[in-house]
Amino acid sequence: LHTAAFVSSNNNDTFGPWPVREGLCTLEMHRDLPIDLQVRHLFATRMIDDVMIGNAYASEEELEACSKINPGILTFGIELDKELTEVEYEILYYKENHANRGDVSEYMARSSAPRGTFANESIQKANAVDMKRGDVVILNDEYSRYKGVLMVSNRWEAGITPGRGSPSPN
């Protein structure tokens, strides 16, 4: 079954097929979000094949942002808590692209590809805090075997910090 969904431009004075000025997105949760985030979210669900803009006219900036999206690659924005070292930057924006390991965990997505590339680099401990959903971490020198692994938390229990084991399921 081929599926499609609508996203909304946030450009001023857009319009649709009827007198509605609040946008015409399929998912209410997308209202007022940047258009590229709406599109990336729909593709990330893996339930939508085509995405259409439901109101006219999207701005040139919105169209350009959408044109850069590859439906087959999950991308998301990151807000940094600290300035990255050169090695951390290279791991985060790994040129080979990140891929979730085959031994999937319900608690995190793990990309171990950078581990081999950066095995001889030092990654100092920084910002070790309890994790919450959506946090991105790079394992450091204290976890030498896993140093350089990039993790994105899907679900984490209070009191758990990276490298101290996964909590048992509830």
Where in the sequence are the language-model features?
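Catalytic alpha/beta core domains of metabolic enzymes, predominantly
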Residues: 1-82
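C-terminal functional modules
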Residues: 83-170
